[in-house]
């Protein structure tokens, strides 16, 4: 799957951007933390669109400035409305609460548990530990680390291969671009690409260019 982040500041723009993005990608990621304001009704609208709902905490590189309790309640509402995916941080102390809620109500939402390192790619043993912890909590493990070298890129690709079908792994930065291009072949369930001029992370590839490259590889 190709996932395109939606990074607009108001809800109507976000929904319009999502509709346009889905002409090129398979799903979108609504970065709810970047919106100026969001209601439960908005979450319901987003949940009807093939998407990942992410309300990234400020302490994990996001923009969510309101209470953690409000964030958790919005994510629960997404689960209640059977959003395709939600993303919650490994460091979020209440992540198991969301899984328990999903299971109790019989929601179809898949839960992605994520980890970010914006400075480096840790050693492979540390990354394995992260992925194992994530998979004990949610359905899909995700990590995004900053790749500084070919060695970092190889580490990330190796882990995609090891956890094929239950991982999303990303090497941020120029050195990590190969992880975005080869990710699907190595076992990542999706790769992120951006609409022109709307990248949400360093090294994100334009979706039209990515599709051209993937067609050449095939």
Swiss-Prot record:
Keywords: Amino-acid biosynthesis, Aromatic amino acid biosynthesis, Lyase, Schiff base. Disulfide bonds: none annotated. InterPro entries: 3-dehydroquinate_DH_AS (IPR018508), Aldolase_TIM (IPR013785), DHquinase_I (IPR001381), Type-I_3-dehydroquinase (IPR050146). Its EC number is 4.2.1.10. SUPFAM superfamilies: Aldolase (SSF51569). The active site is at 116 (proton donor/acceptor), 142 (schiff-base intermediate with substrate). PROSITE patterns: DEHYDROQUINASE_I. It catalyses: 3-dehydroquinate = 3-dehydroshikimate + H2O. Gene3D superfamilies: Aldolase class I (3.20.20.70). 3-dehydroquinate binds at residues 29-31, 56, 180, 200, 204. One of its GO terms (molecular function) is 3-dehydroquinate dehydratase activity. Involved in the third step of the chorismate pathway, which leads to the biosynthesis of aromatic amino acids. Catalyzes the cis-dehydration of 3-dehydroquinate (DHQ) and introduces the first double bond of the aromatic ring to yield 3-dehydroshikimate. Homodimer. HAMAP family: AroD. NCBIfam families: aroD. Belongs to the type-I 3-dehydroquinase family. This is 3-dehydroquinate dehydratase. It comes from Methanococcus maripaludis (strain C6 / ATCC BAA-1332).
């Amino acid at each position: 799957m190709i996932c395109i982040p939606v990074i607009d500041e108001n809800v109507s723009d976000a929904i319009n951007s999502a509709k346009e993005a889905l002409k090129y990608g398979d799903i979108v990621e609504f970065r709810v933390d970047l919106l100026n304001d969001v209601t439960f009704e908005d979450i319901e609208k987003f949940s009807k669109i093939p998407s990942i709902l992410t309300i990234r905490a400020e302490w994990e590189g996001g923009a969510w400035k309101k209470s953690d309790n409000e964030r958790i309640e919005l994510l629960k509402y997404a689960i209640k409305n059977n959003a395709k995916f939600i993303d919650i941080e490994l460091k979020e102390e209440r992540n198991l609460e969301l899984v328990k809620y999903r299971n109790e109500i019989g929601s179809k939402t898949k839960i992605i548990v994520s980890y970010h390192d914006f400075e480096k790619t840790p050693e492979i043993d540390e990354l394995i530990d992260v992925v194992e912890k994530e998979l004990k909590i949610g359905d899909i493990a995700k990590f995004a680390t900053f790749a500084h070298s070919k060695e970092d890129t190889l580490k990330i690709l190796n882990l995609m291969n090891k956890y094929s079908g239950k991982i999303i792994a990303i090497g941020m930065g120029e050195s990590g671009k190969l992880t975005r291009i080869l990710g699907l072949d190595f076992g990542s369930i999706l790769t992120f690409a951006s609409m022109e001029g709307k990248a949400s992370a360093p090294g994100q590839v334009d979706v039209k260019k990515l599709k051209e490259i993937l067609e050449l590889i095939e």
